[in-house]
Amino acid sequence: MATSQSVVGRAKSDSAFREYYRELSGYDEFGPQYADLPMEILVKIFTYLNASDRCVAGQTCQRWLEATQHNHFQEHLWLALHRTTFNTNVAPMADLLVSSRTFPNLSFSEVDFERVGNFFEQFGATIQQIEFRACEIQERTLYNILRHLSSLRSLTIHSCRDLFMCIRLFEDPAERAELKRTLANVRELRLTHNQYLSDATLHRFCEVMPSLAVLDLSGCHISFHKGLYKKFYPASTGQQPSESVLTFHYISRLIEERKQMLKVLNFSETLIDDSALELLTGLQPDLRLVRLELNQCEQLSPRGLEALLHTQTDTLTQLHLTRAYRLTDTCLRQICHELPALRVLRMRECRALSDQGVRELAHLRALEVLDVSYCRDITGEGLLAGLVGQSQGPNCCLRELHIRALNHLSVHAIVELTKWLPELRLFDLGFHHQSMFEIAMQHIFHNLVRLTHLDLEHCDYVSDNGMTGIGMGPLVASDGNKNAYVPHVDTNERQDDTQDSPNVPVVEPIQPPPMRISIRSRAEQQIVEEAERKQRLMAFINTRPNAAAAAKASVETDDHTTNGYSISRLRQLRILNLTRCNQLTDVSLLCDFRLPELQQLSLAQCQQISVEGIRALVRNCPSIEQLDLSECHSLNDRAVEQIAEHLRRLRTLSLRRCHQLTDFSLDYIACHARQLRMLDVRGCKHMCEDPAMRLVSLPLLTTILPGLHDENNVASAGFGITLMASSPSSSAAPRRPIPRPPAMPLLI
């Protein structure tokens, strides 16, 4: 009896406590307790979220945090440390040592390794990928790190100059034997852009990694001349590798020893020539490559490449030939005929290509990624013939299409591509300068609803009408044929139709303007016309009914007969590049610019964007993490205030050459932008010379680009520790927009 009374009393006290807490906090729980769902269901639900949303959801409660740390999700997260000191006695490493989490992927960028401690001894068993990029690390430190990484699958060492200057790296046979047992499962080795890499050092790396399938030596100083090889290897056998030079002849010996296991080779940014490729050709039939990367190889010619590809017809699925200037249509024709399983083909800036070679792409039925940007002799007709010419229906295999800066690409060709490539996820149309481009934009919004990445950089004819679809219905229906949508309507007949359809506004006939002689210059006339067009669009937006009335009206009357499609149809869009689209104004951001998944947005050099557009942007796109507003001269401190207050996930912000900004912008950022990692305020002449002094309250801010002028000096504040989503490696040529930030962080 006493026990039951105590239980009842405890229940009453718990109920009273919950009631007191509810009244105190003003929060009333209602509905099911989603935090108490089984872990399997939570993990299944979180699989439908992207990495950024999962990280934010993990901050809701402890149970959701545990769900986001499931092994399935951890495989795609990276712990990235940038411009910090690796010392286990101080933060951030001291904090990580007491963490209960595991870190399967580590990335160190410009990190100075002072005191490793027992960090890798504690977490090394779970580390699968590790990267060192421009780090200050010694040979003993690297050995002490690798000896604990028993689960390592991938090792990347990029531009670590001091490490390879030491010729004693892995010199001890006993240490190499220990590493060989520990690193037996390593499949990928990337030693990129290392100037002092030698044959001996490469031999030791390959010796301690017996299961290598990926070898990446891009950007290394490899000698392909036989005379130099004979100088350092005077003996005929040449068994002892040289400590002074890196030669392809010795690399080919290493490849021959592992030719049955190697599946990926990368010799990009080297002087590889036909003789070297013919040497690899002699390794058939045991050498069966899956991916081959030869980007920016100036000595590469069709003769050597054709000989090598002839031996890889059954297995090669990815071929990267960016900036191979000497490749011709004949080489592309052989690629299309002899590599039927090819899924990725990148031939950016291969200037000798034309429609004759592109038409042969029809033989690549499994092609998923195509990059022919800056191939200026390719036309829209050639692309259509190669991608959709012989297909009986839509091409549902292609996922990425890069056709940037094709001078002869017509709007009609873009429209046809959008109709026949419905499964595109990435569409790069940068540097398109033909008129009527807004018609192409409307068809992109209508047909490519699964896009996640859209690049319209420097497209001169991207306008508010194309972005919003206002008044674009007739043009979309006629595919841009102006003569097809201007019917002759009698005045009396139009009045009768208006009485029957009161929702349709009366359109007065256009009267020719009186004869006037303008004294404006062409630039002044263009400014006046842009202002009048913006005024008309703003008037249309202000007179629109609310959302419910607009939806009802669109059901009763087909709204697309007058208006087209807005960018809000691309609900899955995550990356949008509108750099230097000068005709865009606040109208595009005010009128239905709702992209809930958008993470990266560039409006650089869109000089007509002001605080009104920014106010609408930050409310309709709350997931933005990287925002570029460089040279948006109409922005002021109020715009930065809106950005800092409403974009809670903002990691990277570029305000370069925004001349109206003052120190008040820095104060707003310091107060609200708690997740900011990188800030660029170069050229903001009304700001103080040292903005880091005003941003000391942001402990996560690692990079500040300050200065009254565009200088290259970089100031660092705080330490850099980041968890970011893993991204597939890309070997494409450097993009033309502003440099990307070091990483896209998603969670702290």
Regions found by a protein language model. Name each.
Residues 275, 298, 302-303, 314-318, ...:
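Tandem repeat domain/solenoid detector
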Residues 649-745:
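C-terminal interaction modules of eukaryotic adaptor/scaffold proteins
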Residues 124, 149, 183, 209, ...:
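Leucine-rich repeat
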Residues 2-284, 288-296, 301, 305-309, ...:
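N-terminal adaptor-interaction module of cullin-RING ubiquitin ligase components
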Residues 1-36, 221, 490-537, 541-544, ...:
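CRL adaptor-proximal regions
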Residues 374-377, 381-391, 396-399, 403-413, ...:
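Eukaryotic tandem repeat interaction scaffolds
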Residues 83, 112, 136, 161, ...:
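Position-specific detector for the leucine-rich repeat
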Residues 223-245, 469-569:
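Acidic, serine/threonine- and proline-enriched intrinsically disordered linkers and terminal tails
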